[in-house]
Amino acid sequence: MNQNSIRIKIKLAHNPYEVVIKKNGLARIGEELKKIGFKKATKVLVVTNKDVSVHYGKEFIHNLSDNGFNPTLIEIKAGEERKNLATISDIHNAAYTSRLERGSLMIALGGGVIGDMTGFAAATWLRGVSFVQVPTTLLAMVDASVGGKTGVNHPKGKNLIGAFHQPKLVLIDPITLKTLPEREFKAGMAEVIKYGVISDKKLFRKLEDAPRLDKLETLTDRFLLEIIQRSVQTKAHIVELDEREGGIRAVLNYGHTFGHAIEALCGYGTWLHGEAVSMGMIAIGQLALERNIWNISDLERQRKVLCQAGLPTIWPRVCAEDVIEILKSDKKVKDGEINFIVPTEIGKVEIIKNFTVNEIKQALQKLASK
């Protein structure tokens, strides 16, 4: 494995692109844009937040300018509680002020929330302009930046407003993880663990064998590159099979159905997305155990790895009836039935939709009593 640069092709019929994992990649953004056909003088709107901008904004803009692009940077307030149409309007206002045209470009420089909102703003500005993902969090690197899902939250649920809009490029620079708060790093590890549970036994065993997963400094560069690469490859393969989530792509939502309910009920921003997904994985694991689909040994293996990553595994104090009401408005509801992504063994899940309200209540009540 080339430790300095890894390229993973996302082979879609109409919108193929590459995920480039490159050490010090931020300093090569201009060159990477030229490689995929963007010309000098192209107007570029870089969307980021204050925390990321402090560390990388100035160098990033200078590199774009030095390569002949015409960049503007906008800082928005990030966080799930700001992931709404009001913030999209702020990005659109910046696009208008910058005179972005159909041939212009938006770049998301930040975490998953920045990527989701920038992608949606790009999808809806002038009926669609190009955008590029430059994720700076582990969660965004392995999950949110790949696959073309963009959108914002609605008061009644997470990501209910959105569009599929594939990026032209995803540029991952692992160096940015050095400035990532520890809590954010741990939250991102939830998505890595998810890939192990749904599809990649080898990745799961690798995570199990690590003494701890909650601190960046305890992981070697090689280990970090490998888990990012394996996660992206898993997602790439699934997205290639099902770009618009008509079938198999739904497995990527493992842990998310209950996780989204936790975020909505506890208030966006109370739990980080990865933390909510961790608790969601615990919940669906319990539901699978109650149905005798999953065994207690694998349930415990999942719990231990989540604990190694410093992630929450205790179900929060939320009313089971309220959870069920949120579940009914989930994007994965089809013909009035909730599609659950259910583990059957480590490395394998199934889509099951015939769980009764009683089964869900019993599983949640059992979790609440632990």
Swiss-Prot record:
<keyword id="KW-0057">Aromatic amino acid biosynthesis</keyword>
<dbReference type="GO" id="GO:0009073">
    <property type="term" value="P:aromatic amino acid family biosynthetic process"/>
</dbReference>
<dbReference type="Pfam" id="PF01761">
    <property type="entry name" value="DHQ_synthase"/>
</dbReference>
<keyword id="KW-0963">Cytoplasm</keyword>
<dbReference type="InterPro" id="IPR050071">
    <property type="entry name" value="Dehydroquinate_synthase"/>
</dbReference>
<feature type="binding site">
    <location>
        <begin position="112"/>
        <end position="116"/>
    </location>
    <ligand>
        <name>NAD(+)</name>
    </ligand>
</feature>
<feature type="binding site">
    <location>
        <position position="191"/>
    </location>
    <ligand>
        <name>Zn(2+)</name>
    </ligand>
</feature>
<feature type="binding site">
    <location>
        <position position="149"/>
    </location>
    <ligand>
        <name>NAD(+)</name>
    </ligand>
</feature>
<comment type="similarity">
    <text>Belongs to the sugar phosphate cyclases superfamily. Dehydroquinate synthase family.</text>
</comment>
<dbReference type="InterPro" id="IPR030963">
    <property type="entry name" value="DHQ_synth_fam"/>
</dbReference>
<feature type="binding site">
    <location>
        <begin position="136"/>
        <end position="137"/>
    </location>
    <ligand>
        <name>NAD(+)</name>
    </ligand>
</feature>
<feature type="binding site">
    <location>
        <position position="158"/>
    </location>
    <ligand>
        <name>NAD(+)</name>
    </ligand>
</feature>
<keyword id="KW-0456">Lyase</keyword>
<dbReference type="GO" id="GO:0005737">
    <property type="term" value="C:cytoplasm"/>
</dbReference>
<keyword id="KW-0170">Cobalt</keyword>
<dbReference type="GO" id="GO:0003856">
    <property type="term" value="F:3-dehydroquinate synthase activity"/>
</dbReference>
<dbReference type="GO" id="GO:0008652">
    <property type="term" value="P:amino acid biosynthetic process"/>
</dbReference>
<keyword id="KW-0547">Nucleotide-binding</keyword>
<keyword id="KW-0862">Zinc</keyword>
<dbReference type="GO" id="GO:0000166">
    <property type="term" value="F:nucleotide binding"/>
</dbReference>
<feature type="binding site">
    <location>
        <position position="273"/>
    </location>
    <ligand>
        <name>Zn(2+)</name>
    </ligand>
</feature>
<dbReference type="InterPro" id="IPR030960">
    <property type="entry name" value="DHQS/DOIS_N"/>
</dbReference>
<dbReference type="InterPro" id="IPR056179">
    <property type="entry name" value="DHQS_C"/>
</dbReference>
<dbReference type="Pfam" id="PF24621">
    <property type="entry name" value="DHQS_C"/>
</dbReference>
<comment type="function">
    <text>Catalyzes the conversion of 3-deoxy-D-arabino-heptulosonate 7-phosphate (DAHP) to dehydroquinate (DHQ).</text>
</comment>
<keyword id="KW-0520">NAD</keyword>
<dbReference type="GO" id="GO:0009423">
    <property type="term" value="P:chorismate biosynthetic process"/>
</dbReference>
<dbReference type="GO" id="GO:0046872">
    <property type="term" value="F:metal ion binding"/>
</dbReference>
<protein>
    <recommendedName>
        <fullName>3-dehydroquinate synthase</fullName>
        <ecNumber>4.2.3.4</ecNumber>
    </recommendedName>
</protein>
<dbReference type="InterPro" id="IPR016037">
    <property type="entry name" value="DHQ_synth_AroB"/>
</dbReference>
<keyword id="KW-0028">Amino-acid biosynthesis</keyword>
<feature type="binding site">
    <location>
        <position position="256"/>
    </location>
    <ligand>
        <name>Zn(2+)</name>
    </ligand>
</feature>
<keyword id="KW-0479">Metal-binding</keyword>
<feature type="binding site">
    <location>
        <begin position="176"/>
        <end position="179"/>
    </location>
    <ligand>
        <name>NAD(+)</name>
    </ligand>
</feature>
<comment type="pathway">
    <text>Metabolic intermediate biosynthesis; chorismate biosynthesis; chorismate from D-erythrose 4-phosphate and phosphoenolpyruvate: step 2/7.</text>
</comment>
